[in-house]
Structure formats: structure tokens, C-alpha cells
Amino acid sequence: VTSPVATPPRTRARIRHISALDGIRGAAVAGVLLFHGGHLNGGYLGVDTFFVLSGFLITSLLLAEIGSTVHVNLGAFWARRARRLLPALGVMLLGVAAYAALIAPPEQLHLIRMDALATVAYVANWRAVFSGFNYWALFTAPSPLDHTWSLAIEEQFYVIWPLVVTGLLAMGRRGADRSAEAVAKRILVTAVVLGAVSAFLSLAFYSWYGANRVYYGTDTRAFAILAGIALAALIALLGPVTARRPRLALEVVGIGSALFLTAAAFSLKGQSLVLYRGGLLACSVAAAIVVAASVQPAPGPLSKLLSIRPLTALGLISYGVYLYHWPIFVWLSPARTHLHGWPLFVVRVAVTIAVAVISYRFVEQPIRHGWRPAIRTGVVYPAAAALVVVALLIGTAGYRPPPHGAVTTDAATAAATRAR
């Protein structure tokens, strides 16, 4: 599953495209949309599925590169991540800047400004931790950037994990010690140990600091990414499951895991005690099992179900859907649209998908696969980021603190919801 295609030495290694993984993305982002629309209690668990997928895919790519070149080209890896993630993020932030300048209430501008700066720096999750933001009250006084905490955790992973893999590769001095198999063994041990530490911290910090620290912390959510990492290492070591009985067993367990995740999505509310007493970990392991069953060469019933066109089509644009949906949901509020319930949800989702498709077709794909700047990427992206920051600062520049004692209702609500 994770073997690179035949490539000359020192070229980029690839892994084969698997439609079922697009379907998993589609199901995950659909859950998030339904949760933020107020129609699925546990739809937020889609984020954990994204974490598992990221750990699996990135580690598979790194192992494929090691197998092909006995090397990890960090600069090329980070450049690919930048081309994949930053253009759409910049477009979203420019949209938020326009919203702040033209629509947002004045008392919200400072909040948006600080959220935007944290988003650009990919530390939004830690801003949420240290500001005391309660995620489960985000519908009360929403910022259009409340959803970027998970993007921050992903980006931190993209920066740190390739360095760890490079270090694990360097532990082998020569020959077989530097093979993809040898590195996969080290990755597996590392993932299991760090995953256990992350799970322990999640349990301990919930007792010490409460749910928000656990929900937002990189250290307390890392076990989901590490579950995907461990799966990638296992598949690299063991290969695909081809024998009939083990394949059937994996399919049955995979279907059971998918049903478990579905039940959790319908029943597991965000402040449920079980969520922080092993529930998030169990859902991450279940997601990893679903991925394992879906990537086998001979498609089974689960893989075929996840490969249906509506899910895979949504999965292809899932990054844009996730990125744009929350600012659009905040903009298309009941007060502005005079809609409620399912009619409001349908309008919000329709606009989100339209924007995501346009972004995918005219921003993300051209930059990712075709267009290359005439000057170095190391100049283009920092310059673009600086322009986005300037636009955000200008868009949120109208804030003035209200006179003493004259706090508006929105401001009071925001202050109660977020100790910022």
C-alpha cells in the first residue's frame, strides 16, 4: 500500500491514490459540518479522523522517500506542504479581513485580529488554551477563525515529524540500518511510546486543568496522529493483508469500527466525561482500523462503500470545505439570513461547497501541480503571508474600546464566553 512507484534515485517518491481515503475525508468533514450546523452531537470527531489520516499519509510518504532515496528532503517536503496548504489559507484570511472591515461588529475586531495572527503563526490551538476559550460555547460569540485550532496542530506535526523521522534515519549508520524497514521499526516504537505518553497526559490534564486544555493541546491530541503513524509503520513492515481469513477478519473489524464511530458521532456530546476518559483515544484507534481496512489492495465492502462518488467528491475538496465553512457559517447567521434549522444549514453548506470548489479549481490545484513562482518559494510565501497580515491588521483596525461601563450585549457575551 505504501510502496513508492518506480522512480529514479533522488526523485520524489509517491504512494498510490486510494479512493476510499477520499471517502473517509468526505465522511469526516460532513460530520464537522453537521456538528457546526447543530445537527450531529459528535460530528467534531471528524477532526480526529483527519489527524489519523495525516499521520498515516505523511509517514507513508516519508517511508516511501526513504525506500527510494535513503534520504528525507526536508526542504522539498515543507515546500510541498506550503503549496498545498497556504494558498487557500491566505484566501480564507483575506475573506475574514473583508468580513472584519465590512460586516463584523466593532467590539469583535480585536478578537478577530488576535485570532488571525495566531492562525498565521499556526498556534491557534495554544491561543485557545491560554485564553480560556470554551470550544463548546463557540456558538455563543463566534469568531470566524475558531476552527483553525486543528489546522495549527496539523501544521505543528508537519514541521516536527519530518525532523523526527530524519533523526530516526540518522540512527542507522549504514546499509540495512538505513532501510525503510529499519526506519519503520523505529517509527513504530516511537509512535507507540509517544502515543502512550499523550494518552496519559490527556487523562491527567483533564483532572488537573479541565476539558479545554485536553481538547486543544497538541500534546493531549497527538495520540490521534500517532495512531496513524503507527499504522503506516505497521503496513510498511507487514505489507498488505492478502490471506483470506486475516483479510476477512480485518474487514469485519473495520466495519465494526466504522459502526462504532457512527454511533459515537450520534451520541457522544462534546462535554461527555467518557470523551476525556479514553473516548477520544478509542475513536482514534477505531479510525485507524477503518483506514487499515480501506487501504488493502483487494477492495472489500467497507472500501467500496467509502469509495462512492458523493463521499470521494466531498473528500477531494475537504480541506477547502473545512477551511471556509466556519467563516461562512458565522457570516450567514440567522440574524442576517432570517433562516433557521435545516434551511439555514442547507444554504450555508451550499455556499461553502461552491467556495471550496472554486478554491480547489482555481487556487489550490494550479499552485500545487502547475504554477511555480519565478522567484524562490522562500521569498514568495513569506511575502504573501506578510501581505495577508497587513490586510488583516487594516481590516480590524477600526476597534475602539467602549466607554467605561458601556459594554454592548455582544461584547459582554464574548467576554463571558472567552476570557481573552
Name what the model sees in each region.
Residues V1-T2, P403:
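Generic short amphipathic/hydrophobic targeting helices enriched at N-termini
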Residues I394-R420:
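Membrane-interface segments at or immediately adjacent to transmembrane helices
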Residues T2-I375, Y381:
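Membrane-interface helix/loop caps of multi-pass membrane proteins
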Residues G370-A383, G405-T413:
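Membrane-interfacial segments at transmembrane helix termini in multi-pass membrane proteins
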Residues I375-P402:
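Internal/C-terminal transmembrane anchor helices
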